[in-house]
Amino acid sequence: FQAEDGIRDRSPSRGLGDVYKRQLEKTAYKDKVAIFVTCYGNRNEPDVIEDLIAILKHNKIETKLVKQEKCCGMPKMELGDLESVESLKNFNIPQLMELVEDNYNIIAPIPSCVLMFKKELPLLFPDDESVQKVKNAFYDPFEFLMSLKKDGNLNTKFIKSLGEVAYHAPCHQRVQNIGPKTKDILELIPNTNITLIERCSGHNGTYAVKSEYHEISMKICKPVISKIETSNVDHYISDCPMAGHQIDNGVQNIEVRSESPFTLLREAYGI
């Protein structure tokens, strides 16, 4: 399927549509980014992709979606189906290589998908030169934003504080060894305090959605839930939306529910 279908089948939106395209044409770009939308971003929460696009546009980043993509292959790899992993790799990598050769950086909104292209595929296919080139061009979204800050190109004019925010750093992001880049970016917002939670949510890919394991997965999530419930937070977030919803299933004593860090950053920008 085409990555655009899931979000463009919707009515014209803040991030996409003719107005958005015209605005981009007038922008003096500082860099180029292609978004690997992912299965989840395309079909489950396209609003999150729109928030990410709005943030990039606000920072004068030329932005496009990967024209065609299939699943990154992480779910198949976790099931040991390496034949399907290779088949998906053989479809996705040529699409991404076209962007790499056109000097695009590539990001994805789901940590598992970022990990697949940055770590897992390069380990599985060490002799595939294209896989290695895609790896070198692939970034976590907040890792990319932090690179803008280091170069003095990140827009830090925020108009809204976020208050107290509990931030769950998902496992598939932590093993990328990039540091808490989401926390680092959000802490640039005035009057915003980020409490970092580095514990497994228990979701673990498809583990938590299987009836025989769901109860165990919620027990794994209990320390995260307890920390959030006792922290008097205005918001709680996770880079992994599945982890966020897993936490939602357990919290009882507070009214707030999980949000995307892209959504909060967009709110802070007032865009």
What are these regions, as identified by a protein language model?
Residues R8, R14, D18-I271:
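Iron-sulfur cluster-binding electron-transfer modules in prokaryotic oxidoreductases
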Residues Q2-D9:
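Short, exposed "boundary/linker" segments that immediately precede the start
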